[in-house]
């Protein structure tokens, strides 16, 4: 009776904005009650109480269907399960026990159902463990600061930016539909396509997905819920060249929900094109000599350049040096300086959910720390770095949160990392796409070259590289070309940039759903392509059964 009465009072206090259904009501009530108890009473004699505490709970289900040569090899639909995590900090906003500044999380199992008592019990268990770990970390941090004094600027920097109280419930706009029988039939048909390509072995086609709801309650009165969903259809296969080199490649189609996948006929076309490209690569001539000159990067190769330089570690993300450790690579010291070609402007969108007809999976309304991000942020303005993406841990150059903490897509833990929503690389006065190849040929002729290269994907031995004859513009696909790294210095000034834009969705660092709007091609000078020497493998004693 006491529990029912307290639950009713909770509903009246938080109102319909928080509680959308009975399940949500029970989960939030359990999290809030146990959080308040821990904040008030969790302390060992003579030790500090936590000043910050957050509980996160994820309810999720997963599925996977995999097939090979027309037969299903794995079909799995897991029921709803639960996982939780606790983040606990001692001290105050200026000085916490955190030494690494990447978030301190401790995970715990959770029931699949909204069981009030079980949820409270599990958060009680994990909070006790997190508190004891925080005490050890606080002592270790104190010792580390004595032996590794901070600069005056570092010492004045708070360890955490305060969050404003907020209640934000985000529900999936469309149900996540898992039709295992349908996907078994689809995967059978798609994987059977490889029966027509006897030189491709160890092929497979599959689809997997995650449907998750994340609940969060903090001691700062942040109450939030948001969905994290995706479905990924993949195909892979291997070929061996006549000289004994193994080449593997993969295809990936990423959407928010299984029902958002292209039609069966379109999927067949994509898998067939993938198989055809793998066969063309197998039979292509090898790169014969060293090349240094202009190279046109198109499509996936163009996106790789921007992702590798701007969106990986050391890119457009604020960085706080861990206590007692050497600093890592970061662009923060270049704020106010030119880092890329002045025709390029880089923006980050958070709420934009569609661009040029393509859904953007990087869209979100509230970040994983309860901060509402700006809908649009200019990170690089005409080549000049203006600001970085950041969470609530301030850095020397970025002392505020941009609302860029994103939940990591995994069913094994509830953690977050700094990541973009949708990055838009805008081009000022770009060149029409159909003129980019002409610009490549002209640049090659100006250097007295007989040929140049177009790179359409960068994937090791499976890279798609094309040799272009400057006389007639004809293209010949080649293989085993080792393309030199394209770093920021290379894109600080480029020869030409396409005005055409491509849109892609991807999982950044295999963690966070993100989207990228980028130039379809970029022409870069002084790129080296050399003949690589891939490892050769011995032929199997017996041939692949389809080759017999």
Predicted regions and their residues:
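Short non-domain terminal segments
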Residues: 8-9, 103, 405
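Bacterial N-terminal signal peptides
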Residues: 4-15
């Amino acid at each position: 009776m006491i529990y029912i009465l307290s639950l009713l009072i909770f509903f009246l206090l938080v109102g319909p904005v928080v509680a959308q259904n009975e399940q949500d009501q029970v989960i939030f009530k359990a999290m809030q009650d146990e959080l308040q108890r821990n904040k008030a009473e969790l302390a060992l004699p003579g030790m500090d109480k936590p000043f910050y505490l957050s509980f996160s709970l994820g309810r999720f289900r997963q599925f996977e269907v995999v097939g090979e040569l027309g037969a299903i090899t794995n079909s799995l639909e897991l029921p709803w399960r639960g996982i939780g995590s606790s983040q606990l900090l001692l001290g105050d906003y200026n000085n916490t026990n955190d030494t690494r500044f990447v978030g301190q999380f401790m995970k715990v199992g959770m029931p699949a159902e909204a069981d009030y008592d079980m949820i409270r019990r599990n958060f009680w268990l994990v909070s006790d463990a997190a508190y004891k770990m925080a005490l050890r970390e606080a002592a270790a941090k104190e010792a580390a600061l004595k032996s590794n004094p901070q600069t005056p600027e570092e010492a004045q920097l708070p360890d955490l930016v305060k969050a404003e109280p907020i209640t934000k419930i985000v529900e999936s706009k469309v149900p996540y539909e898992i039709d295992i029988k349908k996907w078994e039939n689809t995967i059978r048909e798609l994987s059977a396509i490889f029966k027509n390509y006897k030189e491709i072995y160890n092929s497979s086609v599959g689809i997997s997905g995650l449907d998750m709801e994340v609940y969060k309650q903090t001691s700062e009165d942040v109450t939030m819920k948001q969905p994290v969903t995706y479905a990924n259809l993949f195909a892979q296969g291997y070929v061996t060249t006549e000289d004994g080199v193994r080449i593997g490649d993969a295809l990936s189609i990423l959407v928010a929900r299984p029902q958002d996948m292209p039609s069966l006929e379109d999927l067949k076309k994509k898998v067939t094109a993938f198989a055809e490209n793998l066969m063309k690569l197998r039979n292509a001539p090898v790169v014969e000599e060293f090349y240094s000159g202009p190279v046109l990067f198109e499509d996936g190769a163009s996106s790789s350049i921007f992702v590798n330089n701007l969106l990986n570690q050391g890119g457009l993300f604020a960085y706080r040096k861990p206590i007692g450790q050497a600093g890592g690579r970061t662009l923060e010291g270049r704020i106010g300086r030119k880092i890329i070609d002045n025709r390029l402007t880089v923006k980050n969108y958070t709420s934009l959910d569609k661009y040029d007809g393509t859904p953007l999976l990087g869209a979100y309304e509230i970040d994983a720390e309860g901060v509402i991000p700006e809908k649009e942020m200019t990170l690089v303005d005409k080549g000049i770095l203006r600001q970085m993406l950041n969470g609530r841990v301030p850095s020397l150059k970025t002392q505020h949160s941009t609302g860029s903490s994103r939940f990591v897509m995994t069913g094994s833990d509830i953690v977050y990392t700094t990541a973009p929503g949708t990055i838009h690389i805008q081009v000022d006065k770009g060149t029409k796409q159909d003129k980019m190849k002409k610009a490549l040929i002209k640049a090659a002729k100006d250097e007295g070259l007989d040929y140049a290269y177009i790179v359409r994907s960068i994937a090791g031995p499976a890279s798609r590289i094309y040799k272009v004859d400057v006389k007639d513009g004809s293209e010949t696909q080649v293989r085993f070309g080792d393309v030199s790294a394209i770093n920021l210095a290379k894109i600080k000034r480029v020869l030409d940039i396409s005005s055409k834009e491509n849109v892609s969705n991807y999982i950044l660092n295999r963690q966070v759903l993100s989207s990228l709007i980028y130039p379809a091609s970029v022409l870069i000078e002084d790129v080296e392509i050399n003949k690589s020497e891939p490892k050769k493998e011995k032929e199997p004693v017996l041939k692949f059964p389809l080759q017999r």
